[in-house]
Amino acid sequence: MKIVKISPRGYCYGVVDAMVIARNAALDTSLPRPIYILGMIVHNKHVTDAFEEDGIITLDGPSRLDILDKIDSGTVIFTAHGVSPEVKQRAKEKGLTTIDATCPDVTKTHDLIEAKKAEGYHVIYIGKKNHPEPEGAVGIAPDIVHLIEKADDLKTLEIPTNKILVTNQTTMSQWDVQHLMEDIQKKFPTAEFHKEICLATQVRQEAVAKQADVADLTIVVGDPKSNNSNRLAQVSQEIAGTKAYRVADVSEIKLEWLQGVENVAVTAGASTPTPITKEVIAFLEQYDPMNPATWERVRKVPLQKILPRVKVKKEQ
């Protein structure tokens, strides 16, 4: 079996930065305890489990405000997906120490929404409902930001001005965003468009589109909650024309997927730990359909290998 290792794949700089920020927080004895992450720091359970070993508690819930209601003291880390001004204010009112790990690309979108609101615009924001990134973006200006996920959402959308900005969640499929933007332009011809697919997401999607077409199967390594991982599987199927499965780690690979397969493409979401992806590739490289000794699929990567290394600051 030939393995096509799609490149680039895996961690983006925003994810690494967020994890380093959280790791440094865990090592900072001056921060009030307990230390909480407001939702998953990045959408990968292996990462949140590793942080739990570091003493950092991940809390989840229907919204960031709902999660904050569970916290009465300590330190709160805002995730890479960003939060609304209301969340920041609520944390301040509760007397919590806050650390912001928002991805710079997300911050750029928030700044754009604020600037356009000041100019009297309404904003159409293309994103996944019930995902934390759109929650934070809509929360920048909930009175003028309209979240849409599908073309059907446009049918009932009415905006009381011709000053309209269209932007999007950074981890969406660029092809889905393009199709929706074309539909929006037909309904709102005066709209201005700012496509905000982050570069890391874009190049990973384009790599799958160009490299997965030679494979019989694509395996995307990523958490089920990771939007960018799910979009990579979608790109493989819809753009490259190659059947794809998303797995959290090697243990989720089903042997029947590999029957009759000669070429397997492997990629990983931007929040997927590199050792988890390497373990998937190593399994596929040694797999022999005629040898049951090669069929074992058990995650063996220790959690302490998941998080980035950071230097412990010496006290002066």
Swiss-Prot record:
Binding, [4Fe-4S] cluster: C12, C103, C198
Catalytic residues as annotated in Swiss-Prot or TrEMBL: E133 (proton donor)
Organism superkingdom: Bacteria
Binding, isopentenyl diphosphate: H43, H81, H131, S226, N228, S271
Cofactor note: Binds 1 [4Fe-4S] cluster per subunit.
Keywords: 4Fe-4S, Iron, Iron-sulfur, Isoprene biosynthesis, Metal-binding, Oxidoreductase
Positions contributing to (2E)-4-hydroxy-3-methylbut-2-enyl diphosphate binding: H43, H81, H131, T170, S226, N228, S271
Residue positions binding dimethylallyl diphosphate: H43, H81, H131, S226, N228, S271
Keyword Metal-binding: yes
Cofactor annotation: [4Fe-4S] cluster
Pathway in which the depicted protein is active: Isoprenoid biosynthesis; dimethylallyl diphosphate biosynthesis; dimethylallyl diphosphate from (2E)-4-hydroxy-3-methylbutenyl diphosphate: step 1/1; Isoprenoid biosynthesis; isopentenyl diphosphate biosynthesis via DXP pathway; isopentenyl diphosphate from 1-deoxy-D-xylulose 5-phosphate: step 6/6
Entry EC no(s): 1.17.7.4
The protein's enzyme class: oxidoreductase
Catalytic activity: isopentenyl diphosphate + 2 oxidized [2Fe-2S]-[ferredoxin] + H2O = (2E)-4-hydroxy-3-methylbut-2-enyl diphosphate + 2 reduced [2Fe-2S]-[ferredoxin] + 2 H(+); dimethylallyl diphosphate + 2 oxidized [2Fe-2S]-[ferredoxin] + H2O = (2E)-4-hydroxy-3-methylbut-2-enyl diphosphate + 2 reduced [2Fe-2S]-[ferredoxin] + 2 H(+)
GO biological process, one term: dimethylallyl diphosphate biosynthetic process
CDD domains reported for this sequence: lytB_ispH
Annotated GO MF terms: 4 iron, 4 sulfur cluster binding; 4-hydroxy-3-methylbut-2-enyl diphosphate reductase activity; metal ion binding
Family named by the database record: Belongs to the IspH family.
Record's function text: Catalyzes the conversion of 1-hydroxy-2-methyl-2-(E)-butenyl 4-diphosphate (HMBPP) into a mixture of isopentenyl diphosphate (IPP) and dimethylallyl diphosphate (DMAPP). Acts in the terminal step of the DOXP/MEP pathway for isoprenoid precursor biosynthesis.
Record-linked PANTHER family: 4-HYDROXY-3-METHYLBUT-2-ENYL DIPHOSPHATE REDUCTASE
Name of the protein in its database record: 4-hydroxy-3-methylbut-2-enyl diphosphate reductase
Organism: Bacillus thuringiensis (strain Al Hakam)
